[in-house]
Amino acid sequence: MSKVDFLHIKGARENNLKNVELTIPKNKLVIFTGLSGSGKSSLAFNTIYEEGRRRYVDSLSSYARQFLGGTSKPDVDSIEGLSPAISIEQKTTHNNPRSTVGTVTEIYDYLRLLYARIGKPFCPKHKIKIEGKTTKLIIEGIVDFPKNSKLIILSPVVELEKGTHQKLIAKLKTEGFLRLKINNEIVSLSDDKEINLDKNKRHSIDIVVDRIVLNEEKKLEISEAISIALEYGKGIVKVENVETGEIKIFSSNHSCPKGDFEMPKIETRLFSFNSPYGMCQNCKGLGVQLRGDYNLLVPDQNLSISEGAIKIFESTVNSSNQEWQEFEALLNYYGIDKNIPMRKLSESDRQIIKYGSKEEIDYIIKSQSNKFKRTKRIEGIIDKVERKYLETSSEGIRTWIKRYMSEFICNMCKGSRLNEHALAVKINGLNIWEISSLSINDVYEQSINLNLSDYEREITTLLISELTSRLSFLVDVGLDYLTLNRMAESLSGGEAQRIRLATQIGSNLTGVLYVLDEPSIGLHQKDNERLIKTLRKMVEIGNTLIVVEHDEDTMRASDFIVDIGPKAGSHGGEIVALGSVEDIIKNPISITGKYLSGEWQNATPKSRRSGSGNVIKITGASQNNIKKLDFKIPLGKFIGVTGVSGSGKSTLINQVLVNAIEKGIARDFSHDKNKNYEKIEGLLYIDKLIKISQSPIGRTPRSNPATYSSLFDDIREIFSNVPEAKARGYQKGRFSFNVPGGRCEKCSGDGSIKIEMFFLPNVYITCDHCDGKRYNEETLQIKYRSKSISDVLDMTVSDALAFFENRLIVKNKLQTLEDVGLGYIKLGQSSTTLSGGEAQRVKLASHLLKKSTGKTLYVLDEPTTGLHSHDVSLLLKVLNRLVDKGDTVIVIEHNLDVIKNCDYLIDLGPGGGVNGGKIIATGTPEQVAQIEKSYTGEFLKRVL
């Protein structure tokens, strides 16, 4: 191989990397592995990818660079042979409620085009195919106007489009038209006055073709006008009754012969819920509406109205408040008793309380000195909060009202986001919303089995080829269970990453360096093989893949492995071993090699816990693909929830169980609309539910392991009790870098100063006043055992454990951090530099320190994300310690090392999406392994 066939990195020192030198073969599948925090991401993303991105951005103009964000040069001497780099990380970046799987993959765009080309409109009422009207039928429709009506015949040429439209207006003027109707106003073209339209606003323009008085003699004139209007309006003509304002729309394109349903021109924008042309006008294309929620307005049905059952009248009941007097008049008019519990009211009474009177009511409003008689319809509590929410200009009032509102499925489009015209168009009996509601696998099957005429096949061959190609890529990366209308913001990090991966495969780029972050996360072993084939395919077409990965199957399928370590943090950052799987196994100091060879492994427990004997039982769980499911959680055990991707694991635990227990603990069952189960039993056995994720332990660089675990409070207490500190009157707050007093004010306790570079990325330099120590000179003079507070923050957990050996409270907290494998991290290390696995273990350590009641339920969703097999062994020790204290731990997991260590498994399936949502097996890992239809059981047999 020549020099250009390799990527050469020299002197990489980003984060904990120790002057790394490395040569990687190009056009290969390269795996970066090592313990959590060893420096894998620092090398792959922060060095190689960032340098590739920086070189690309630097090639652009300074004007373009300001829109792309700053790119600082990684701390590396040189990188040679670098190709254009694309990063695909585990991040859900689409927070827009309008983004769906279909839109982010652009598959929905192809579907819109397909429906615009070969879709057939059907009348939603009569279910018959819609055909265009002839001129004769249009004239017959016009004659239905009253005799001698003054009519304007209009030809729509622009509908809700941005722009000045100057060229069109000038063209129409030269063609002899005298008037236009612009945004519902008649404008003369005969005047010399120029028509100026705002280019940033949407406009509608109709040509005034003719103005006539309707009678028998005008039929010929009407016919000629209609012909002209249809020509310019592309098959659409509007007829307006000047006196009544009534407008009839006729189409030579599409209209129901049995009714008044008219189809606009079928084009791609009709099927977009982001376009005013296609969106449901009621919910503006969101599919949901914010409306008053009766369960929030009346949270306690056992109270009467007089006792304050209705929250918005809670403080004004029986007062002189005008709104209360109006509402009381409503109650009196219908004879509703305000002194009985709300639950005892009839349904008709509740409807009146919700939506008010249908007719006008006579009532009297009393003030301190006067009485006023009024007659009007009185609104109900739901109407009231919705009106106030829309009318108020006060953000405070709007926030207060929003407490009593929830998102409900739009009652007009039923959540489809589209208007009735878009939903009327069908292919093979399905409209675009119905096809988007199918799983990707089903959409693929529908696409390749379309029943088309020769003409339709000819005009859609390339379109269907592109559509099925993109769908097949999503199937290949294990996302066949997703639906196209799934909200993008609801995707897990692994799902979002694999969607971007599928998009890149579809681009067919070659000569690219892809950097991926654990693409196997969230994938069942059953689906992992397809993912590996996809990665190999990307390599085969001429790309280099650097994949940060811990999955053994992926490592064994790779061409080259880089093992980084030997441990984590300051004890990592070096290349331990590189080469083939065999090369890694042969290396005596490679921890990865020991696990690959089987020398080290996470052993299967010799026995399973029997638990406390108590259970939580949920009956009738229904959410997403889970329908009327009954299940139980045995307490005092380590429980694993398993199943193929999309089988319903997260739905069952995060959306059903967690929701039910949180409301049960809070005794809050007011959100009946969100109640996705029929019954829950055993709540008395749980007094606390804790979800532990891999999210950062703090949002700012100021947060660190010492502050999160409250360890820093104890350390500051120790320093405040030093004799010198007492003599100076220093309190505990003096040793905080977050508040004025003891911190360095030049850098505000950051230790570094940001310098704005405008078109270049911002530069951070060490504060020259405190030399990066964060504190002022007076504070640093206070020493405990010859160390300042800054020196202590710079210690690793292991060093601090020896330093504070005689301080029991501090020692216990440090020992717990050491026990979970975090002895290498520094006490003052910024939380933003911790990996997901490290952040999770800091959280677990803080919970280990708390006294157990035996009634705590811990829930973890894929806790092994980012963890090496050695890290998994540490995680298992921590989780087992929590269970040994009498608490219950539930993990949603695919990792077999974790699954085989569980006491009890709940395996869902058999497939994903609509093919999942059922409990396939429950019991110990040994019992599940015997269930033939369990995919998890099939793989468990190999490791038990």
Curated annotation (Swiss-Prot):
Zinc finger motifs (C4-type), residue ranges: 256-283, 744-770
PROSITE patterns on file: ABC_TRANSPORTER_1 (PS00211), ABC_TRANSPORTER_2 (PS50893)
Pfam families listed in its UniProt record: UvrA_DNA-bind (PF17755), UvrA_inter (PF17760)
Residues bound to ATP 1: G34, L35, S36, G37, S38, G39, K40, S41
Main location: cytoplasm
InterPro entries attached to this UniProt entry: AAA+_ATPase, ABC_transporter-like_ATP-bd, ABC_transporter-like_CS, ATP_grasp_subdomain_1, P-loop_NTPase, UvrA, UvrA_DNA-bd, UvrA_inter
Domain (ABC transporter) ranges: 1-242, 359-597, 610-935
Source organism, top-level taxon: Bacteria
One Gene Ontology CC term in the entry: excinuclease repair complex
Protein localization: Cytoplasm
Keyword hit for Nucleotide-binding: yes
UniProt keyword list: ATP-binding, Cytoplasm, DNA damage, DNA excision, DNA repair, DNA-binding, Excision nuclease, Metal-binding, Nucleotide-binding, Repeat, SOS response, Zinc, Zinc-finger
Binding-site positions, ATP 2: G643, V644, S645, G646, S647, G648, K649, S650
One BP term from GO: SOS response
Family: Belongs to the ABC transporter superfamily. UvrA family.
Purpose: The UvrABC repair system catalyzes the recognition and processing of DNA lesions. UvrA is an ATPase and a DNA-binding protein. A damage recognition complex composed of 2 UvrA and 2 UvrB subunits scans DNA for abnormalities. When the presence of a lesion has been verified by UvrB, the UvrA molecules dissociate.
Assembly and binders: Forms a heterotetramer with UvrB during the search for lesions.
Protein name, UniProt field: UvrABC system protein A
